[in-house]
Structures are given as C-alpha cells and as structure tokens.
Amino acid sequence: MQAAVRFEQHGRPHSDLMTWLGNYRAVTPGVEVGDNTTIRLDQDNEPQPDAFLRIAPSHGGQSRTGDDGVVDGPPELIAKVAASSASYDLHDKLNVYRRNGVREYIVWKVLEREVVWFHLCDERFEQLQRDDAGLFKSEAFPGLWLDSANLVAGEMAQVLQVLQSGLTTSDHAEFVVRLQQEADKRAEKS
C-alpha cells in the first residue's frame, strides 16, 4: 500500500499548482503540462515530478514522448510540492535536473509556506528573484507569472489574476508567435 498523501500538505497545493500551470497552457498553443508523469532523464534517473510544463516536441521542445508513453529528456520546467521531502528535492533532485538540462525548477515548501524557483544559468541553477511587485516571472515561459505569496495562502483568484496579467504582455504574444513559427518550420521539413 502506498504512503498516505495528505490533503493540506500535498493534495490541495498540488491542485493549485496544476490549476496555475493548466491556465497558462490553455492560452499558450504549443505548450503541454503533465501531472505525475514519469520522465526518463538518463539511465539512472526516471523521476515522477508533481508537475511539468514543456514546449511540445512539434514546437521545438527539448523532450519527447517515447513509444512507451514515458517522457524522454528534460521538460523545460518541473514543479514539486514538498512537505517532508524538501531537503531531497532541494539537493539531490536539484542536481539531477541541472545535469540533465531542466531549465526551471520550482519547489513549493509547504510547511515553510515558501516557493523557491530556480533557473538554469551557465549549467548552474540559480534562484530566480521576485520582481519589485513580489512576483516570479519565468524566463523559459514568457508570461508565466506567479504571485507566490497568494499561492501559499490559497488565494487562487489572485494567483490567476496575476497570471492573466502576464498572459496579456507582448512577451507572451511574441512567444506564441515563435512557437507557431517553429511548428510551421518543422511541418515543412516532414
């Protein structure tokens, strides 16, 4: 029998994280979100993160879906809800994801009521800093903005309002155009 998954420490935060990522995917053609999916990074590491966001293979993404349905290669962003495993998620997994080219890694430390966001820079993970308004803004996914204070407080209406602000930026619009251009280029070659 599997270990119990607690509602407050995992179930609700996981649902909120998926809601945020799913809303981004809904208005960003060429982007895919996964929930508890096995990812084959290398011969020694097949994690099953809580969530991931990737650029679809057809739109230039760095991961593929194998014939067995497992994701091969690193998605651009991985997210984890961590209660008791925060130390493992911030050390061992962090290094595995870095070595394999995951561009961004989010860890929601539920018990500490904190979100930590890392981005890959020169083959090293560095913490992404919040802007002056206290928001995280993804570098891999333009327009993916996170109000982490409201996320940990369970204020999803505010989280989605901030995300919507990111989705109305010219950076997001240009990203959608770039994704479509990449898909068109790949379609012409096939």
Residue ranges of model-derived segments:
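Gly/Pro/Ser/Thr-rich low-complexity, intrinsically disordered segments predominantly at protein N-termini
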Residues: 1-190
